[in-house]
């Protein structure tokens, strides 16, 4: 257990963003599965190139962990930053909408008496609210992609450590899930944003399953070749994204306190 605490503490520095799925209602961004899959497969190949260069003798399980870790385990991974600034990705709200208009209908917004406070609120929401994208007809926040890779890695790390002192894979999996729930409830959710996101937990878990699939029976599996580790198939994000990633289908719990940079939650929630 002493090995698991530092991993949980690491979560404090991992995520703070939230998503307002309702902003994207009636907007219907285009399906970006192909674009996202291309980026993911490029990053996975880059991770494999690094593994085969510096860790060629590692186990399949270690390689799977290194692939997820390659995406980053901190706040706003490089891939998420790239997607947030991309003009090629259809997302909502788009960059073209002025910040003063972008979050006027957000569930996190409230009426304030002074214009300078309104401007502060605009920038606060700009920092904390992530855009919504369409993956195979399912609308998700960009933050879920970081949860998939970064928290998926943390779940997988906890799982592998837990296997050293629990009796079964099922018990190790339950320990990883329990630590994830604890982090979402007390650190990432209530303390940082006032939101407990069930959709975050689902994307965390699916990232963990991806890591397991890489060395088991997933459609994208690792295999040994003369060059080292390689994929037997292409990664497809749609194999893991499901409606429970959508916070309008799988609503969050909103604590009755301050959230999103000291802004009280809206009465609309």
Q: Residue locations for each model-derived region?
A:
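Intrinsically disordered, low-complexity, mixed-charge
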Residues: 15-178, 188-201, 205-269
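Sec-dependent N-terminal signal peptides
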Residues: 3-12
């Amino acid at each position: 257990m002493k090995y698991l605490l530092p991993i949980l503490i690491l979560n404090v520095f991992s995520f703070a963003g939230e998503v307002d799925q309702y902003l994207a209602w009636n907007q219907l961004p285009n399906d970006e599965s192909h674009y996202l899959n291309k980026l993911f497969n490029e990053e996975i190949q880059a991770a494999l190139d690094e593994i085969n260069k510096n860790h060629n003798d590692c186990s399949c399980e270690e390689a799977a962990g290194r692939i997820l870790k390659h995406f980053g385990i901190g706040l706003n991974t490089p891939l998420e930053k790239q997607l947030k600034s991309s003009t090629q990705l259809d997302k909502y709200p788009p960059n073209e909408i002025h910040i003063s208009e972008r979050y006027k209908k957000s569930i996190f917004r409230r009426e304030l008496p002074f214009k300078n406070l309104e401007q502060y609120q605009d920038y606060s929401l700009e920092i904390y609210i992530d855009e919504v994208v369409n993956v195979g007809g399912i609308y998700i926040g960009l933050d879920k992609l970081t949860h998939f890779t970064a928290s998926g890695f943390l779940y997988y790390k906890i799982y592998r450590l837990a296997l050293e002192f629990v009796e079964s894979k099922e018990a190790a999996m339950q320990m990883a899930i329990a630590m994830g729930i604890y982090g979402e409830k007390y650190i990432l959710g209530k303390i940082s944003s006032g939101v407990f996101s069930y959709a975050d937990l689902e994307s965390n878990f699916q990232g963990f399953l991806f890591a397991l699939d890489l060395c088991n029976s997933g459609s994208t599996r690792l295999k040994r070749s003369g060059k080292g580790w390689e994929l037997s198939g292409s990664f497809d994000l749609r194999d893991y994204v499901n409606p429970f990633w959508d916070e309008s289908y799988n609503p969050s719990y909103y604590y009755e306190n301050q959230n999103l940079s000291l802004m009280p939650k809206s009465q609309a929630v």
